[in-house]
Amino acid sequence: MKALLLGAPGAGKGTQAQFITAAFGIPQISTGDMLRAAIKAGTPLGLEAKKIIDEGGLVRDDIIIGMVKERIAQDDCKNGFLFDGFPRTLAQAEAMVEAGVDLDAVVEIDVPDSVIVDRMSGRRVHLASGRTYHVTYNPPKVEGKDDVTGEDLIQRDDDKEETVKKRLAVYHEQTEVLVDFYSKLEGEHAPKYIKVDGTQAVEAVKAEVLGALGK
């Protein structure tokens, strides 16, 4: 199973990724992890990427694609892999097809923006312990205070409504192009496109995703 998982920040993608990788016995591949591993291992591509990152630049697509090809040639990918957050752009998706890396399925966890804003902007965190609350779904006993220590809870910058909306706008801009690209591919290059309602309970989303993937 060679699949790509798409989903906005806060859509519950990480949880579903764990279910998919466990069900098919495949690794989850994210470009961030891959870059860190290549840099740590000191591979030629890793060294090139490190130089660019150290200079404050963005790693070029050709380096990323090269790393992906190296990564998916490893033994643990013999039954497939799950791409998470890659390809991120149309250029990357096209380069993957040209490089002969085909996908069996593209899975999109679809959650309306209003739900994601509600989920994320309601989060409150106790920094010292990492305990997380939600003003609506999992409120502390005393508003704004940690249940255990009574210390203040904060809203992380990442969870502020304005920030969430900006991240969602970027996600939609990138993803719509990818969805369009994959849905137009024909013949052996064409993956199955699966769109799942991510507002359902976690287990219901899991059942729908795995069912559509043939598990």
Curated annotation (Swiss-Prot):
Protein residues bound to ATP: 10-15, 123, 132-133, 200
Record's subcellular location: Cytoplasm
Region listing for LID, in residue ranges: 122-159
Metal-binding among keywords: no
InterPro entries: Adenyl_kin_sub, Adenylat/UMP-CMP_kin, Adenylat_kinase_CS, Adenylate_kinase_lid-dom, P-loop_NTPase
One GO BP annotation of this record: nucleoside monophosphate metabolic process
Pfam families (UniProt xref): ADK, ADK_lid
Catalytic reactions on record: AMP + ATP = 2 ADP
Pathway terms, separated by semicolons: Purine metabolism; AMP biosynthesis via salvage pathway; AMP from ADP: step 1/1
GO MF assignments: adenylate kinase activity; ATP binding; nucleoside diphosphate kinase activity
Binding site for AMP: 31, 36, 57-59, 85-88, 92, 156, 167
Main location, first listed in the record: cytoplasm
Family stated for the protein in its record: Belongs to the adenylate kinase family.
Official protein name in the record: Adenylate kinase
Lineage of producing organism: Bacteria, Pseudomonadati, Pseudomonadota, Betaproteobacteria, Neisseriales
Gene encoding the protein: adk
